[in-house]
């Protein structure tokens, strides 16, 4: 289960916060390549946010190459160069 403390900050949206936290976890190697991420509904429920917020964050990470999706399977972490802690 991925749980993040998200709070909307002035000038940013919840989707941007979630996107940044997921991206950081991927780059720091906390979420390893090939890992299946929670479904949009599951992550939304666990973090008290909307499915649309999760979808927006996931889609941005796909566009940037951090995630890839498999139809009817979900979202997975792509192989990216990890940053040192």
Question: Where do the protein language model's features map onto the residues?
Answer:
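N-terminal basic, amphipathic alpha-helical segments
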Residues: 1-85
């Amino acid at each position: 289960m991925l749980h993040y403390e998200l709070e909307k900050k002035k000038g940013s949206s919840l989707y941007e916060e979630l996107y940044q936290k997921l991206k950081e976890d991927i780059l720091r190697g906390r979420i390893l390549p090939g890992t299946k991420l929670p479904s949009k509904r599951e992550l939304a429920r666990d973090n008290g946010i909307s499915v649309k917020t999760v979808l927006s964050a996931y889609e941005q990470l796909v566009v940037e190459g951090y995630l890839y999706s498999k139809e009817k399977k979900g979202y997975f972490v792509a192989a990216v160069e990890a940053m040192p802690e």
